[in-house]
Amino acid sequence: MSNQVIDLLKQLRQAAIARKLKVLIDYHEEDSYLMRFANSAISLNTNEHLIRLDYNAFEGRKKVSYSLIVDPSDLESMEKGLDILVQMLPHAQSLSYEPTFPVYQKDVFDESAYDPALAALSNQERLEYFNTLAQGLESDDIKLSGIFSNGTTITAQISTETEHTQYFRSTDAQVTAVLSSESLKWEVNAEQSAQKKSDLDAPALHEDLSLLVKHYLADKAVQLPVGKYTVVLGPAATAELTWIMSLYGMTGQALKQGYSFLKEENQGDQLFSSLIDLTDDPREAEIFGQAADRFGLDRKPFPLISEGRFQAFMWDQDSADEFGQKPTGHDVGHLSLVIDGGKEQVASLQELLAMPREEDILYIPYIHYMNVVNPSQGMVTGSSRFGALFLKKDGTIEVPYNVRLTQKFTDFFGEGVAWLSEKQVAYNVSSSYGRRNPSALKVPRFICVKEIEISHSNPSY
């Protein structure tokens, strides 16, 4: 497979040189599978195999791009795309800066995040996985829905400057299972990210779903008073908050365009809890890390927060060119963010519920419809959903109706952080739309944060 891709890129490079074009050629191939469930039945089972080419032509301060979905045997159509670039360049407006043209100094071949067993997963295995996680939990009132998405992604690059190529292949799976009560209108869910087949663990999801359904059926449903609570975040909430925080606050582009909540002078400042260490770590195959970025820069661990101190901004090549900065190897389709684990020995939902409690704790596994309210202040909002629990000091458990949180990133990850689980898990944040781009974070199983304010509390589910 890799030889076919590289041979194609080299043919296209020669075709571009013959047209006197200075071109970066990006190759993207996906083999994607999706099984969707609704009302305790398969509602969709589909797959697609797509190959895309992205051409970027450079001429001084001019840059134009053209993309197409291709048949790999139809070289003529691909070369017509190059002809379109020739026609576009004279009409392009010059940029205010000189964009860097990639000059690859070596071949890069990276399949560290590829697993042939996951790539070959069958429909029967996907169905058996869902049957296992939902076994004994469905009823006339409680219905199963969700998705099982998995696939293989290949990306590769070549430029007209050298014959060196970059080639990356990875496999991924993203599972979301939801059980909902048609009469009471509550929903609970469980999720899993996988880079290899052995990561798939349907019994673990069944255990979490069983526990949540048990409490949602038996425990009292309550409207919580607004106010401040000690909150335990699940991996979904932690990962989504971290993902948005990194994109809105920790990139050079966000800094220079004025919407980051961090300033240049904040580098080195203690803005977060000393328990928080956040790194973009491309060595982590579990979260689809890759060895080099799109411009050929070697990817190395890049500390963003060290013991609570903000370290540095991430610079992609184009932003670095525009603002006169040094790129940091972040011209990638996705980051590989890791929050280090802590010292708390709590590795499962069952263990969290069994912990002795000195105060009431609001468990929020997932923050729904998360949005940035004010990026320059780092303020986000979202509501609890899919399995929140109110763990009372007296040992009892109640089921809270949805609540809204509107807080700053520094509230979630600041001095209020009480503890982090030692156990870490991968959480998948891949989009279901557009081209396949496996994305995940590695975060503590639980993070406990004090003084999180509930600004609104629903009177029902």
How should each PLM-predicted stretch be described?
Residues 266-461:
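Dual-mode signal for accessory low-complexity, basic/Gly-rich regions
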Residues 1-290, 297, 306-309, 431-437, ...:
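Active-site bordering "gate/hinge" segments
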